[in-house]
Amino acid sequence: MQLVLGILMLAQLSLPPGASLPQVMSANFKPAGAIKAGQKADIVVSFTVIKGFVIDRTPQITLKLSEVPGVKLAKTEIAAPPEDPKSKDEYFVDLPSIHVMATASKAGKYEVPGKLTYFFCNKADGFCSKQTVDVKVPLLVQ
């Protein structure tokens, strides 16, 4: 009986064939200042969430980056801090920022590919899921 009940619950949570979840959270990239060739740059990654959704504090938001020719990354995997002083539950009230530290060997435009992973919940229906989205960290180096 429990098995049947479990299968029925999973069927209700599944999406119709061909449907996919909306991208709940998006990343915004902004350098802390002008990026100069040969100097370490701090790119601040901030986040915005679709109304009606919340982001879990744990597991942490992670950004896994891939090295590209001409750009040296201080870290290829960065996790956002799970602390949020305003939060009274497991969800963020104020989303954290992540700092990507990178050094480009010469002037030019670069895009550092990566994967942003986070867990979200829909406050209206209680649906929660893990989501991984492709991102590109833009670098305009002088």
For the regions a language model picked out, list residue spans one by one.
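Extracellular/lumen-exposed scaffold segments
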Residues: 13-142
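Sec-dependent N-terminal signal peptides
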Residues: 3-12
